[in-house]
Amino acid sequence: MNKKTNLIWIDLEMTGLIPEKDVIIEIATIVTNVQLHIIAQGPSLVIHQNDEILSNMDQWNTEHHTSSGLLRRVRESSLSCKQAEAQTLEFLKKYVHTGASPMCGNTICQDRRFLYNYMPTLERFFHYRHIDVSTLKELVIRWKPNAKMIFEKDSAHLALSDIQDSIDELKHYRNVFINV
């Protein structure tokens, strides 16, 4: 295991897309090596939010987080955002040096915006760079629109399954598009 080169994959579920008004309701992480083999799966943590905050979610988030069961789990959780941040950092420090890993995932800049607002210590744990799988997807759509290179996934909109999908998606693009 190389704590200098391992990659941290992260996904957040939020009440919406605007970090100034919406909040994190779930966080999960997975650590892989550079060949994208999973080394360790971090805790998948559901963060308590009060009913006032949850009632301000838009229709899309309300429907998806209700159908996945996440909204019920948020109400039942007693975990604070700070506690989730501390538990996530405790896990990550076992596998990756501070500042070594880019933030990996899909549309990861959005997650980083929320981490900056709500989990700043965790946000600073990452390198400033990203490995954003959605960039490759957008390039394939634009450069090879008729090819069967686009990775199809059936997301549950739960943080841990979304990370696993992102890792599989990057493996797919590495094999069929990048040819490394």
Curated annotation (Swiss-Prot):
Organism: Ruthia magnifica subsp. Calyptogena magnifica
Active-site feature positions: 128
Keywords, comma-separated and alphabetical: Cytoplasm, Exonuclease, Hydrolase, Nuclease
Domain Exonuclease: 7-170
Gene: orn
Annotated EC: 3.1.15.-
Any one GO biological process: DNA metabolic process
GO CC list: cytoplasm
GO molecular function ontology, one term from the record: nucleic acid binding
InterPro entries in UniProt: Exonuclease_RNaseT/DNA_pol3 (IPR013520), Oligoribonuclease (IPR022894), RNaseH-like_sf (IPR012337), RNaseH_sf (IPR036397)
Subcellular compartments: Cytoplasm
Highest taxon of source: Bacteria
Recorded family membership: Belongs to the oligoribonuclease family.
The name this protein goes by in its record: Oligoribonuclease
Protein function: 3'-to-5' exoribonuclease specific for small oligoribonucleotides.
